[in-house]
Amino acid sequence: MSIWVDADACPNAVKTILFRAAERTAMPLILVANQSISVPASRHIRTLRVESGFDVADNEIVKRVEPGDLVITSDIPLAADVIEKGGFALTSRGEEFTRENIRGRLNIRDFMDTMRASGIQSGGPAPFSETEKRAFANALDRYLARAKK
């Protein structure tokens, strides 16, 4: 099993948690981005740089993810593709995407896209907080505990 990160928009605090987890568990951690990313020297951590472009990193993750792998992303369509392939998806804020909730999340995303296209401003996500950092760390620990079994 591996942990894949949609790394271009992933908060640094989450990356730090993931670096520690990769070292602690010896689980492969792959950060996929269209720019260079600094990572600690480790045999468990690597980067995969892709070309710039719409969904290029997402498509590369979907192509490589295996059943049981975890993907860290806030991209709902990417999460849906990962779940379809038998993987798990978690946001950097600690929310888990599941077979039970992904369709509803896609519907809400599509609705919000329609609202934005019609000129209604919806705002963006709130700044990343310490509470969300803890929620992510706890959700990651739950996944790692399940993966050990």
Curated annotation (Swiss-Prot):
InterPro entries recorded: UPF0178
Source species, domain of life: Bacteria
Species, as recorded: Tolumonas auensis (strain DSM 9187 / NBRC 110442 / TA 4)
Taxonomic path: Bacteria, Pseudomonadati, Pseudomonadota, Gammaproteobacteria, Aeromonadales
Protein name (database record): UPF0178 protein Tola_2809
Entry similarity comment: Belongs to the UPF0178 family.
